[in-house]
Amino acid sequence: STADAGSFLTDQMGEKDLEGFTLRILSTTENKDGGFAFGTSQFIPDENEPGVVSDAIMERNNLIEQTFNCKIDVQFTAAYEAFVQKVTNDYIAGDIDYDVIASGISSNGLSALAASGYLEDLNAIENSYLRLDQPWWDQQAVNGLSIDNKLFFINGDLLLTDDERTCMLFFNRDLIEENQLEDPYALVEAGTWTVDKLYEMARAAAVDGGDGKMDVEGGEDTWGLIGAAFDTYKMVLGCNAPMISKDENDMPVITMLDEHNVAAFNKVYDMMSDKDHVAYLENYYRWDDWTNGEKFYNQFYEGRALFYANLIGSLNKQSMQNSSVRFGVLPLPKYEESQSGYACTIDPYAFTCIALPKTGAGNLDKVTFMLEAMAYYNSEKVVDLYYETTLKLKRLNADDNKAEEMLDIIFSNRIIDLANIYNWENCIQYYNQLLVNNSGVVSFLEARKDALQNAIDQTVELFRKLQ
């Protein structure tokens, strides 16, 4: 019965009558073939994407609404700049008619709204029901996204499109066998999956189709690794080398010029700039040339690339669904074997978090209660379904008994770099620029360090003034 099912929630949350309160969520809409298949159904059932995950969300909402006498309402708006502009306009007009916003956390998403002072500090809400130290909230994000102990957005089991925007590598299992290469899964488990090993295997698998040159047009060449220029940054993060770290006072500290970070960039640069074995999109086409971009990435789906740097959400793309390639999933490689663990960064543009806009409505206790209930429910009832149906059984091969273990490693080793979130001085493009013209990483970064520090200081000062 509903009452029996509701006891599962009340055992955790306690009895509460929310007196018909409606939780109003504003979320962004995305292109589902771009890896955003759950942008709708993580909040409400999606009529266009039926399945067990959508059904579980419907059951969650019904149970919470009946158990606590409340309602869940979701409205959708365009993403990125349009989303930021809508919230900004509504805030200035005093016309915010939603309690929760959900979007990516980049500088054209939630971090822009935080830097404008429009969001509640989740660590400072009186009578909050959010238990952010619990495992259904992403602890890497709780610790990584704050500045000066102020936390403006968060993710966890409440959301699905955060996991989908986590960076990793696909690999072609058939090419591994054909080239008699080491099993990447065994390397990951042994802690020996490194950039050097990735590069070694990429060189071994790359094959010229017979015309004496490697290119992406003829359809005959096989590449060791394909990706985009921005994968340089992601791989450096995989070496546990963030551009910006935090000190003991939770303050941002520039670390991009640390010896380890410079060495990590140089190692990744040597691989990414090897045009005989590695192909990145921008070396052939513009980053926003979607037609040729699709053709470029089809090299992996057609079996002509050993490794493919992308995001978990690519599993939902039609090209991946239709591919006959037997593929596996891997975390980003370490800098060296002695690195303590793997590190997988995020795509901030659509790595979804939730935030609470400042409304002055005085209902944050009810808002946080419902969010906590939804997150807890998902941790118990939805996350496993998402894993099994979407990430594993939906597309990963039935004979791949290591994929779910790899997903656990990827998701439990997310690394948050504040440079990736706030993009002060367009710093996340630094490595892309060096990939095109490497005049020396140290001198390049030194010339930009002061301006970067000044931009960081301005954000910190703004946050300190917020009440």
Predicted regions and their residues:
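Paired acidic/hydrophobic, glycine-rich loop segments that form the ligand-binding mouth/hinge
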Residues: 98-103, 301, 305-310
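Conserved N-terminal structural module of periplasmic/extracytoplasmic solute-binding proteins
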Residues: 1-115, 439, 445-467
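Conserved C-terminal helix/tail region of periplasmic/extracytoplasmic solute-binding proteins
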Residues: 358-368, 378-467
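Hinge/lid segment of periplasmic solute-binding proteins
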Residues: 6-21, 34-36, 78-81, 108-167, ...
